[in-house]
């Protein structure tokens, strides 16, 4: 007998609580106002510190409530009108309603809280640059459930695609390219065959990656090749089920940093903020201060964003990266820039590999791990026993965890800094220098 499958009903939304008046005292790193009512913490999206607001609880909890903003009775002097018409719906930006200097102060406060066991807020140095038009890479989502053309970014509250007309954090050239691409997609519909789209701007120019989930006709393909030629854009296709397209050296992308040229595959990771990347690399060189008698290990090195600048100054540099394709790109970049003191190794940095570098006399380490941090590799670092460790992180909470472990094992924090790599968003990049204690 065939068993009948029960129909899953969507969860009912909790009814809104009564309208309440709140005095907002603080701000979370996700840009939610922090208030208290009868001693219980309430997080209010869209409310700013110093404001008196009315709001209704929509997600009650045992330890705290979440509420939706109804009205602002007394407005903060730091509140500004968002530049983007999609702010509040699009999940990309969370701080556009807060004046830029106040954004930076809020991020510094949050970072100080994360690192409170290691140093004081006054010790945190800050790097900032432009607050808009900085993003040189964007992944565009497609809504396949609608007949109309819906391209943009995911909603803040769901996986729904917000139909974006303009994005203020994209570079001006990418904004123009996005508008032109939408016109082309309307004229030559291939949405049912598209998984998603990536836009890129680098030293080489503009490019578009179209990731296909099914094949398109030669006529359709030619229409996009013609469009790309008219727009002076390099077009890349990723075929259905293909993980990575093989490219010739001429087809590879490239960007410049520290007077060096780095080639990379369009699917490789690069920092999305060119201005801040230049500043970040320069600061890393200044803090770590590599000399000709230094041997530096660059962990999670990618295609050599830090490795190549290090090799200009140090006696020897070893870059370590999991992906073999990026290791090959790093080697090519070293050769391209004439750096004979730089080598690259493919290794899984979640596994002990200390013996691999035991004969190298490594005295300095730079690491730039993913959001999960580098906890599995810390014992290997401690075994190598470098005099200095420069830790670059996109997740301050895992940085704090890893740094506290290093401090327990003979290191001290010398410097720490916030780098506002992602203005208007809740994300920050952090740099920390640790010194081995004698």
UniProtKB/Swiss-Prot annotation:
Record-listed E.C. numbers: 2.1.1.190
GO-annotated molecular function: 4 iron, 4 sulfur cluster binding; iron ion binding; RNA binding; rRNA (uridine-C5-)-methyltransferase activity
Binding residues annotated for [4Fe-4S] cluster, in chain numbering: 84, 90, 93, 167
Catalytic residues, chain numbering: 394
Protein name: 23S rRNA (uracil(1939)-C(5))-methyltransferase RlmD
InterPro entries assigned to the protein according to its UniProt record, in alphabetical order: 23S_rRNA_MeTrfase_RlmD (IPR001566), MeTrfase_TrmA_AS (IPR030390), MeTrfase_TrmA_CS (IPR030391), NA-bd_OB-fold (IPR012340), SAM-dependent_MTases_sf (IPR029063), TRAM_dom (IPR002792), U5_MeTrfase_fam (IPR010280)
Signal peptide: none
Keywords annotated in UniProt: 4Fe-4S, Iron, Iron-sulfur, Metal-binding, Methyltransferase, rRNA processing, S-adenosyl-L-methionine, Transferase
Pfam families for this protein: TRAM, tRNA_U5-meth_tr
GO annotation terms (biological process): rRNA base methylation
Keyword hit for Chloroplast: no
Family: Belongs to the class I-like SAM-binding methyltransferase superfamily. RNA M5U methyltransferase family. RlmD subfamily.
Annotated TRAM domain residues: 13-71
Catalytic activity: uridine(1939) in 23S rRNA + S-adenosyl-L-methionine = 5-methyluridine(1939) in 23S rRNA + S-adenosyl-L-homocysteine + H(+)
Gene3D superfamilies named in the record: 2.40.50.1070, Nucleic acid-binding proteins, Vaccinia Virus protein VP39
Function of the protein: Catalyzes the formation of 5-methyl-uridine at position 1939 (m5U1939) in 23S rRNA.
Entry binding sites for S-adenosyl-L-methionine: 271, 300, 305, 321, 348, 368
Lineage summary: Bacteria, Pseudomonadati, Pseudomonadota, Gammaproteobacteria, Oceanospirillales
């Amino acid at each position: 007998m065939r068993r009948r499958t029960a129909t899953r009903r969507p969860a009912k939304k909790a009814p809104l609580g009564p309208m309440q008046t709140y005095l907002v005292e603080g701000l979370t790193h996700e840009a939610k106002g922090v208030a208290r009512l009868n001693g219980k913490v309430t997080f209010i999206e869209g409310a700013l510190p110093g404001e008196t607001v009315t709001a209704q609880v929509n997600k009650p909890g045992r330890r705290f409530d979440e509420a939706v903003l109804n009205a602002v009775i007394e407005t903060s002097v730091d509140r500004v009108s968002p530049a983007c018409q999609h702010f509040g719906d699009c999940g990309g930006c969370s701080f556009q309603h807060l004046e830029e200097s106040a954004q930076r102060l809020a991020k510094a406060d949050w970072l100080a809280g994360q690192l409170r066991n290691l140093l004081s807020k006054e010790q945190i140095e800050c790097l900032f640059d432009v607050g808009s038009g900085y993003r040189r890479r964007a992944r565009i989502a497609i809504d396949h459930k609608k007949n109309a053309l819906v391209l943009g970014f995911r909603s803040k509250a769901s996986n729904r695609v917000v139909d974006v007309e303009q994005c203020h954090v994209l570079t001006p050239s990418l904004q123009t390219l996005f508008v032109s691409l939408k016109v082309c997609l309307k004229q030559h519909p291939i949405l049912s065959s598209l998984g998603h789209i990536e836009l890129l701007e680098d030293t080489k120019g503009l490019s578009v990656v179209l990731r296909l989930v099914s094949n398109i006709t030669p006529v359709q393909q030619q229409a996009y090749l013609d469009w790309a030629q008219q727009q002076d854009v390099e077009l890349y296709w990723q075929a259905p089920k293909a993980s990575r397209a093989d490219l010739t050296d001429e087809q590879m992308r490239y960007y410049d940093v520290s007077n060096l040229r780095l080639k990379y595959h369009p699917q490789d990771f690069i920092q999305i903020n060119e201005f801040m990347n230049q500043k970040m690399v320069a600061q890393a060189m200044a803090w770590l201060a590599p000399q000709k008698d230094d041997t530096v290990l660059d962990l999670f090195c990618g295609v050599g964003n830090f490795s190549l600048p290090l090799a200009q100054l140090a006696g020897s540099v070893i870059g370590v990266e999991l992906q073999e394709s990026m290791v090959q790109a790093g080697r090519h970049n070293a050769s391209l820039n004439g750096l004979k003191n730089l080598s690259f190794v493919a290794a899984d940095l979640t596994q002990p590999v200390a013996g691999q570098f035991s004969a190298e006399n490594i005295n300095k380490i730079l690491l730039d791990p993913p959001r999960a941090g580098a906890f599995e590799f810390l014992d290997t670092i401690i075994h190598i026993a470098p005099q200095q460790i420069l830790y670059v992180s996109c997740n301050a909470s895992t940085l704090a965890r890893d740094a506290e472990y290093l401090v327990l094992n003979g290191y001290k924090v010398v410097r720490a800094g916030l780098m506002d790599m992602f203005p208007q968003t809740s994300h920050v990049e952090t740099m920390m220098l640790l010194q081995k204690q004698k």
